[in-house]
Amino acid sequence: MYTPSYLKYSIISIISVLFLQGTHGDDGGWQGGHATFYGGEDASGTMGGACGYGNLYGQGYGTNTAALSTALFNNGLTCGACYEMKCNDDPRWCLGSTITVTATNFCPPNPGLSNDNGGWCNPPLQHFDLAEPAFLQIAQYRAGIVPVSFRRVPCMKKGGIRFTINGHSYFNLVLISNVGGAGDVHAVSIKGSKTQSWQAMSRNWGQNWQSNSYMNDQSLSFQVTTSDGRTLVSNDVAPSNWQFGQTYQGGQF
């Protein structure tokens, strides 16, 4: 079959562009930012935080955690997301290794300081305040602050999603943690065994989700949707005799 010469050149051009995009593209999703550290050598100062996870050791997050600047935190919706990160462009301090951290806290802006002199977390900077043990995996302590390349990666978690039920009757505050896949939860619905339909929960703060319905004395199911649009249903996670302050484990992405 005859193919016009101009069409041949067009096809070759398209193939060349696709090849280059496949080779380089957006550099695998890598973006540029900076990292500092906090929390002490045992990361005890990172416990709690704006995502609501509490004891990061007990919740399974360990010390590979980060507080995100305003530009990344998204008012708490990014809590639970995972980032692959490496120190770069500073051979004096960079160790050449790569780590994966989970977003567990917020690094607040400091408008009284300039962006390049202490106001590291000021908008629009993309900044990670790492737990000290995490920082020391990619850079030397004396560096203080280093340039990094980072990208979102799937979260690899052991066990199922955890639902910690706090609050009281007519105020169910559910902390959702240990979420795999995208990691950051953007929508949650709850259903009791005595109710007819799913009820959307509202995000109270961090990854604490709220329902004002009376859910006592019935088993509870949860529907969790992450930022990538995937939804997972965990049926009858909490038995009918569930108690406030207890944690129940569901399925996993």
Curated annotation (Swiss-Prot):
Keywords annotated in UniProt: Cell wall, Cell wall biogenesis/degradation, Disulfide bond, Membrane, Secreted, Signal
Cited InterPro entries: Expan_Lol_pI, Expansin, Expansin/allergen_DPBB_dom, Expansin_CBD, Expansin_CBD_sf, RlpA-like_DPBB, RlpA-like_sf
Classification via CDD domains: DPBB_EXPA_N (cd22274)
Pfam families: DPBB_1 (PF03330), Expansin_C (PF01357)
One of the record's GO cellular component terms: membrane
Expansin-like EG45 domain residues: 48-160
Record bears the keyword Signal: yes
Disulfide cross-links: 51-79, 82-155, 87-94
Membrane topology: Peripheral membrane protein
Superkingdom of origin: Eukaryota
UniProt KW Calcium keyword: no
GO biological process: plant-type cell wall loosening; response to herbicide; syncytium formation
Cellular localization per UniProt: Secreted, Cell wall; Membrane
Signal peptide stretch: 1-25
PROSITE patterns: EXPANSIN_CBD, EXPANSIN_EG45
Expansin-like CBD domain mapped to chain residues: 170-250
Family: Belongs to the expansin family. Expansin A subfamily.
PANTHER family: EXPANSIN-A15
Protein name: Expansin-A8
Native source organism of the sequence: Arabidopsis thaliana
Gene: EXPA8
